[in-house]
């Protein structure tokens, strides 16, 4: 905790390396802000922290073009590039272009991203129906601070997931604030079990022949199967989806957008409704995917921004739903939150920094889900440094998610496969009630599948020129089954929505 606070303070003391086209601008807008014009360039170390991903290090740069400033704080063009890695072996390599001027009267966004993830979170299907037990993966060098008897592996709730994404989206105007949207892209998932030898590094797993105990207690035992491997053995994850696949997609929908700006609106409504058709090929590293993995999903999102006092106090909330309406989506795509425009490095749901802060990343995995985020955004101080405009804000928030389309589990097959696994591999197979919630009759409990997952917290925002927002969020889950830790911090760029 002490290291994290030192890290946050260090970041807050950093000022961007900033260069701009030299134009003496004296105009101010209706809120008294000095208007920016021309090209503005900002570069920063890509440093951050995520409760699920660890500390992040790298570099990022953002170029904005404001033209004559008549639309400020809206930009005409934005070019964003980032390369970074985290201490939990999660990588970000991304280039994004966003423009309202390249094609007259249209908005065009192009994004190319590669995200290697050596320890992607996997907590099973259907939320609370799947048991989360912190003792199974929590390791501490002090044995008194961990459950030695229950401990399995730090990778018990993990699998390896590398993702390549390319997306091109365009928006045009139908009438006033009503827009049409279309997009295409491809998602390439390369999936496997965690590479334990790589994760162990120099801490090789070896057994002392005299004591029969590991010579290095921190080293993970590669013989222990995590939840992902168990789901494959028991048939919950089909072999055709177990190793990933490549998925081209087409998207079309409608948008209503009356917001007065994109990054931090002070008033207005944003709503979208769209369909995404996704195909499947090259699953399992070259094998043809089953036709059933072609699927159609529907998304609806509603955001509302209400000014309670000028631009200093804003009540903002977001409601959303994502459902599968035809075909079958592979398990790894059910944690991908579809969006009309790619603005963040990753859209994952439900759980984690991009959906439900304070709840573990991908804790709620189902065929369909709904969510809500509520924030009270305040600007407590405004000031200038040179020609740059800054503000400091605070934003208490509440996040909620529910399952709308659960997985239909074949309970008889699961029990048969588990019994077979228990007989063949008793040392590394736990009782069924360590994986699923069971009722008094020993059947998988259905009663809590639709129960809400909730979290709350507080955000600190430091913004430059309205569009460049440095964010520090603290959050905690309201149920320990979603996260046993209370100190969950997320240091990112921008608002959640």
Question: Which residue ranges define each predicted feature?
Answer:
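Outer-membrane beta-barrel initiation region
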Residues: 20-101, 109, 194, 207-266, ...
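Short loop/turn motifs that connect adjacent beta-strands in outer-membrane beta-barrel proteins
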Residues: 21-22, 26-40, 67-76, 102-108, ...
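Transmembrane beta-strand segments of outer-membrane beta-barrel domains in Gram-negative
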Residues: 22-23, 27-29, 111-113, 120-311
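Residues that define the transmembrane beta-barrel architecture of outer-membrane proteins
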Residues: 39-41, 53-57, 75-77, 89-93, ...
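Transmembrane beta-strand segments that form the barrel wall of outer-membrane beta-barrel proteins
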Residues: 40-51, 74-87, 93, 270-281, ...
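Transmembrane beta-strands of outer-membrane beta-barrel pores
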Residues: 49-51, 63-65, 83-89, 99-101, ...
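C-terminal outer-membrane beta-barrel translocator/porin domains of Gram-negative envelope proteins
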Residues: 240, 250, 261-388, 404-406, ...
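Outer-membrane beta-barrel "beta-signal"
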Residues: 462, 485-497
């Amino acid at each position: 905790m002490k290291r994290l606070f030192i890290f946050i303070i260090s970041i807050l003391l950093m000022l961007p390396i900033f260069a701009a086209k030299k134009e003496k601008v004296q105009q101010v807008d209706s809120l008294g802000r000095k208007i920016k014009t021309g090209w503005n360039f900002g570069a920063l170390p890509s440093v951050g922290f995520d409760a699920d991903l660890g500390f992040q290090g790298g570099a990022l740069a953002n170029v904005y073009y404001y033209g004559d400033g008549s639309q400020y704080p809206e930009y005409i063009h934005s070019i964003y590039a980032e390369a970074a890695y985290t201490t939990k072996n999660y990588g970000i390599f991304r280039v994004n272009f966003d423009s309202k001027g390249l094609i007259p009267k249209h908005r065009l966004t192009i994004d190319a991203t590669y995200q290697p993830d050596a320890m992607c979170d996997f907590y099973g299907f259907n939320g609370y129906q799947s048991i989360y037990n912190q003792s199974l993966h929590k390791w501490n060098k002090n044995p008194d601070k961990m459950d030695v008897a229950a401990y399995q592996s730090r990778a018990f709730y993990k699998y390896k997931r590398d993702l390549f994404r390319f997306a091109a989206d365009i928006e045009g105007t139908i009438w006033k604030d009503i827009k049409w949207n279309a997009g295409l892209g491809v998602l390439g998932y390369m999936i496997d079990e965690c590479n334990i030898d790589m994760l162990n590094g120099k801490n090789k797993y070896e057994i002392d022949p005299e004591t029969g105990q590991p010579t290095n207690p921190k080293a993970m035992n590669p013989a222990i199967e995590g939840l992902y491997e168990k789901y494959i053995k028991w048939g919950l994850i089909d072999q055709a989806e177990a190793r990933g696949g490549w998925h081209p997609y087409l998207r079309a929908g409608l948008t209503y957008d009356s917001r007065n700006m994109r990054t931090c609106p002070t008033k207005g409504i944003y709503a979208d409704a769209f369909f995404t058709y996704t195909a499947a090929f090259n699953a399992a590293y070259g094998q043809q995917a089953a036709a059933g993995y072609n699927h159609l999903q529907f998304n609806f999102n509603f955001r509302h921004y209400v000014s309670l006092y000028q631009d200093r106090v804003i009540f903002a909330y977001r409601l959303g739903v994502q459902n599968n309406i035809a075909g079958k989506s592979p398990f790894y795509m059910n944690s991908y939150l579809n969006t009309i425009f790619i603005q963040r490095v990753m859209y994952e749901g439900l759980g984690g920094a991009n959906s439900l802060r304070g709840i573990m990343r991908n804790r709620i995995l189902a065929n369909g889900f709904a969510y809500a985020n509520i924030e009270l955004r305040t600007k407590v101080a405004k000031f200038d440094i040179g020609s740059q405009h800054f503000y400091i804000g605070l934003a208490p928030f509440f996040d909620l998610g529910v399952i709308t389309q659960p997985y239909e589990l074949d309970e008889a097959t699961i029990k048969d496969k588990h019994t077979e696994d228990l007989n063949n591999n008793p040392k590394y197979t736990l009782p069924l009630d360590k994986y699923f919630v069971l009722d008094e009759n020993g059947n998988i409990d259905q009663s809590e599948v639709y129960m809400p997952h909730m979290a709350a917290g507080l955000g600190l925002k430091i913004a430059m020129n309205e569009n460049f927002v440095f964010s520090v969020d603290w959050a905690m889950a309201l149920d320990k089954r979603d996260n046993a830790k209370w100190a969950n911090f997320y240091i990112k760029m921008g608002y959640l929505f």
